[in-house]
């Protein structure tokens, strides 16, 4: 016999080396949906302990971006890992469907409601537009391998959800948290609507910084408050000086505010050149800086007074014909300015609070479009930001402008329009943070939640401690109505508001939100009441829509109908970007505490934003945008999923072509490891060929033990949401424990041992156990590839890997086992040391390959005792044709030191002939009649009982 190739156990599998994921994944997706994979998972997990990850709804507008992909893939990985851990973990994806961005898109095509199109038609067009956007995003998410209730997602515009949003408002009102007030709110003049805190972002803006004089109305009364030397009361006009960066708010000024405990100085500005004599009141600490910037060099102090002494003194408005009082406020500081604060209660939260205390007029001369109202003296019809220059001109004319310069500062902007916003007092509906103890209860509930990372707790506590009332009303067309009736004269809520809300909710459940605008009040409350009450026509903040989904979705959908005793909270986990501490996490917490007295979630996990390889934000103008569709079309979704799982997503997450290439390289290593397992399981039937654990070759037992240890760590990391630890452990297992050692050592035995003999079957048993575990470790992350592996594995099995649980067939090495982990760790160290010398010998042309070598190991007694346990099988571990062990005392001069203490190695080229079958150089090659080209071991493996392997 001269061709021994057919006698080898060569690897064979239908699992290709190349993933070709971009082409193959869509075929797998089709099968998943044709065979209802998600439905199969639900059936398999029915009755198991529940795990609810509630999906924060993305906005139904535009294509998905890489941040969406990161978020949805993270959720999908966690859901799938929980499923494998034996939980019933449904996933109902959601969409936020009301609000301004959708209105703006529809306005472009159809015009503004009430002009070219009726409000009812406009709402219908918004609904159609949002539905189309949902469908587009849905297909993109499905392509990423995300499993869920895609046929029945939740949309905040679904009639049932809209009805439940209205019911949520009723519950909050019933608990005493609803408030109507005329208050300053963040107002976007482009939106023409109030904004929630979460809709405000801060950007740098250049504004005029001005110091303005308010002349004392009663000079004598003002002077009397200062401890001036007798007869030295100074000369010139007497004024307080305020500082502001919003000159446009001066028409609404109704007071100047001082701090009760601050010291104020009366400064005499001396006549000098063009400088007229005048007297200025300033905070002592700030006087020098104010005078310096006004280029006033010649001055002296006349006297001092406490802020509390100056309360209720009157000063002339700088350009209107009325006086304003000096009032006291804790918000006044000496951080900047003059120590005296211009107070316009209609244009600032602190001004409003202090104005209420002094019963000041809440002047609001600005319309919803940011233009001064027609009756605004001097400035009617001007846009407020353009009016700054006009205000400065008037101040100069009146001689009231002490100083001005351009000032760059952080200023609130609309998150949609990216334009500066204003504070504007309007009648609005609020959820009060304090009138029924909501703030205190919310802060208490924060402590009951597990925040990951931990800093999330401090962040949200700080935000809740400092936040104003939640303005929930909007002056928009496309939104859930604030379905309340108020008395036409007293503006009080109808006494039966809760019952009326339920009636409206039932109508909305049937016909959608348009029902509110269509219904006649008399139908709900009778003619008599209808004559005295009117509908509220405002809509709800979209953050309210999404914030109450713990009730409108989780508490209401059949998918989440788990036993009450399992449900400590509506959801187990909320997982979103770190910006949601001020957004969805907070709106959900506040609404849930207001409705139910407890947090809506047990755990909150946040991820960072996606940046490019240089840490820059994604931007079309920079050209660094990575689109999910481009990645899936080029590399496949599994590469994107592996990228997500490989990052420490609690910080910023970097992505670039180079980073994705690294993910693709890591993927190839894992895929090739899996392919080795599958190819070497050819001809193996688990039903008949499994070798009992106690009869397995020692090295095979060790490999299964390593898989057992890896699985424990991997499951723990999945449970703790440390996905990058999962991928690190997976890579280490595949590349180091398997690839660099075990798989390398077993190739000889696997390929050359007797087909179906104990030596081969022991090895295949280990490979089978390991791939059964490996495919499950991979499934949450590389879902497509895991499915592909699953379908190539031997033995009877369920249709999908995703319906099962972690593999239970692995075992750990028994305690006290002779060939334990410590033993194999030392053997690997010996092998690594020998390998370095083999490489050197190859470089020096002493040998061609490792199998041409014979090595002699000179070792100390302790090491010899370990190495000799492998007997003649040491050579198989070292991949050499022969390996001899001798005491250190017999070391020859040619033996070289290794990195291991107590080990020297001599490498020599074997003089024996090469076996044509196993390629080992063995002395008995050519001595066996009829088999002159092969060694005795191969003859036994081909025609005899096969070699015996105990250790390796």
UniProtKB/Swiss-Prot annotation:
Protein family per UniProt: Belongs to the class-I aminoacyl-tRNA synthetase family. IleS type 1 subfamily.
One cellular component term from this protein's GO annotations in UniProt: cytosol
Source superkingdom: Bacteria
Chain's role: Catalyzes the attachment of isoleucine to tRNA(Ile). As IleRS can inadvertently accommodate and process structurally similar amino acids such as valine, to avoid such errors it has two additional distinct tRNA(Ile)-dependent editing activities. One activity is designated as 'pretransfer' editing and involves the hydrolysis of activated Val-AMP. The other activity is designated 'posttransfer' editing and involves deacylation of mischarged Val-tRNA(Ile).
Residues reported to bind ATP: 620
Keywords for this protein: Aminoacyl-tRNA synthetase, ATP-binding, Cytoplasm, Ligase, Metal-binding, Nucleotide-binding, Protein biosynthesis, Zinc
Protein name as it appears in the record: Isoleucine--tRNA ligase
Motif 'HIGH' region boundaries: 58-68
């Amino acid at each position: 016999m001269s061709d021994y190739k057919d006698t080898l156990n060569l690897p064979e599998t239908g699992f290709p080396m190349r993933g070709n994921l971009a082409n193959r994944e869509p075929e797998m997706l089709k099968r998943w949906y044709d065979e209802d994979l998600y439905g199969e998972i639900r059936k398999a997990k029915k009755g198991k302990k529940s795990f609810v990850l509630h999906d924060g709804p993305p906005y139904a507008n535009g294509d998905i971006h890489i941040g969406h992909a990161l978020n949805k893939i993270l959720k999908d990985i966690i859901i799938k890992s929980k499923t494998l851990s034996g939980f019933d973990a449904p996933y109902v994806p959601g969409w936020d469907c009301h609000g301004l961005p959708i209105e703006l898109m529809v306005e472009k095509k159809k015009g503004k409601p009430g002009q070219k199109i009726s409000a009812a038609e406009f709402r219908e067009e918004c609904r159609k537009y949002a539905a189309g956007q949902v469908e587009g995003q849905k297909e993109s998410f499905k392509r990423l391998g995300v499993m869920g209730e895609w046929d029945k997602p939740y949309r905040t515009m679904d009639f049932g959800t809209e009805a439940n949003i209205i019911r949520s408002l009723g519950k909050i009102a019933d608990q005493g948290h609803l408030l109507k007030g005329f208050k300053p709110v963040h107002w976007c003049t482009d939106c023409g609507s109030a904004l929630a805190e979460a809709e405000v972002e801060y950007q740098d803006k250049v504004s005029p910084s001005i110091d303005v004089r308010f002349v004392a109305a009663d000079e004598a009364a003002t002077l009397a408050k200062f401890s001036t030397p007798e007869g030295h009361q100074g000369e010139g006009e007497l004024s307080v000086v305020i500082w502001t960066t919003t000159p446009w708010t001066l028409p609404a000024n109704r007071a100047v505010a001082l701090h009760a405990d601050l010291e104020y100085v009366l400064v005499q500005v001396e006549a000098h050149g063009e400088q007229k004599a005048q007297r200025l009141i300033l905070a002592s600490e700030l006087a020098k800086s104010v005078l310096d910037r006004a280029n006033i060099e010649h001055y002296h102090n006349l006297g001092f007074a406490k802020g509390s002494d100056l309360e209720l003194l009157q000063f002339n408005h700088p350009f209107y014909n009325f006086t304003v009082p000096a009032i006291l406020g804790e918000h006044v500081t000496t951080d900047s300015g003059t120590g005296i604060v211009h107070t316009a209660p209609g244009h600032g939260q602190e001004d409003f609070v202090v104005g209420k205390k002094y019963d000041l007029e809440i002047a609001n001369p600005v319309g919803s479009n940011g233009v001064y109202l027609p009756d605004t003296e001097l400035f009617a019809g001007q846009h407020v930001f353009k009016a700054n220059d006009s205000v400065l001109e008037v101040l100069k004319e009146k001689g009231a402008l002490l100083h001005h310069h351009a000032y760059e500062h952080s200023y609130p902007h609309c998150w949609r329009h990216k334009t500066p916003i204003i504070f504007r007092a309007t009648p609005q509906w609020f959820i009060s943070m304090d009138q029924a103890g909501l703030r205190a209860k919310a802060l208490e509930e924060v402590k009951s939640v597990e925040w990951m990372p931990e800093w999330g707790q401090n962040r949200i506590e700080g935000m809740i401690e400092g936040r104003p009332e939640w303005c929930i009303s909007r002056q928009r067309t496309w939104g859930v109505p604030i379905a309340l009736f108020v008395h036409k004269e007293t503006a009080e809520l109808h006494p039966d508001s809760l019952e009326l809300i339920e009636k409206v909710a039932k109508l909305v459940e049937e016909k959608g939100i348009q029902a509110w605008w269509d219904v006649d009040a008399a139908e709900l409350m009778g003619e008599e009441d209808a004559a005295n009450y009117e509908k509220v026509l405002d809509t709800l903040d979209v953050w309210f829509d999404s914030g109450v989904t713990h009730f409108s979705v989780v508490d209401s959908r059949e998918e989440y109908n788990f036993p009450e005793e399992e449900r400590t909270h509506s959801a187990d986990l909320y997982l979103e970007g770190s910006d949601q501490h001020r957004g969805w996490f907070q709106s959900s917490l506040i609404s849930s505490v207001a409705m139910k007295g407890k947090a809506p979630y047990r755990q909150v996990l946040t991820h960072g934003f996606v940046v490019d390889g240089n840490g820059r934000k994604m931007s079309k103008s920079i050209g660094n945008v990575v689109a999910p569709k481009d990645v899936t079309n080029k590399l496949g979704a599994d590469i994107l999923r592996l990228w997500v799982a490989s990052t420490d997503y609690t910080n910023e997450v970097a992505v670039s072509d180079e980073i994705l290439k690294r993910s693709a390289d890591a993927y190839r290593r894992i895929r090739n490891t899996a392919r080795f397992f599958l190819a070497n399981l050819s001809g193996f039937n688990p039903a008949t060929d499994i070798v009992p654990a106690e009869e397995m070759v020692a090295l095979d037992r060790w490999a299964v033990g390593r898989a057992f240890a890896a699985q424990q760590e991997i499951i723990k990391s999945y449970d703790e949401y440390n996905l990058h630890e999962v991928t690190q452990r997976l890579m280490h297992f595949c590349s180091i424990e398997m690839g660099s050692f075990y798989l390398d050592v077993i190739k000889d035995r696997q390929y050359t041992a007797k087909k179906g003999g104990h030596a081969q079957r022991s090895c295949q048993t280990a490979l089978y156990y390991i791939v059964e575990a490996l495919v499950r470790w991979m499934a949450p992350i590389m879902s497509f590839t895991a499915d592909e592996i699953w379908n190539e594995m031997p033995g009877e099995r369920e249709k999908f890997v995703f319906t099962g649980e972690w593999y239970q067939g692995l075992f750990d090495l028994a305690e006290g086992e002779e060939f334990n982990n410590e033993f194999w760790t030392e053997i690997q160290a010996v092998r690594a040391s020998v390998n370095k010398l083999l490489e050197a010998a190859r470089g020096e042309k002493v040998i061609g390959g490792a199998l041409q070598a014979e090595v002699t190991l000179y070792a100390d007694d302790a090491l010899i005792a370990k190495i000799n346990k492998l007997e003649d099988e040491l050579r198989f571990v070292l991949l050499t044709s022969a390996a001899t062990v001798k005491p250190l005392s017999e070391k020859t001069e040619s033996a070289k030191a290794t990195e291991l203490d107590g080990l020297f190695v001599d490498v020599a080229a074997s003089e024996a002939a090469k076996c044509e079958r196993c390629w080992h150089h063995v002395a008995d090659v050519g001595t066996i009649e009829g088999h002159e080209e092969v060694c005795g071991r191969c003859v036994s493996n081909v025609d005899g009982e096969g070699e015996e392997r105990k250790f390796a």
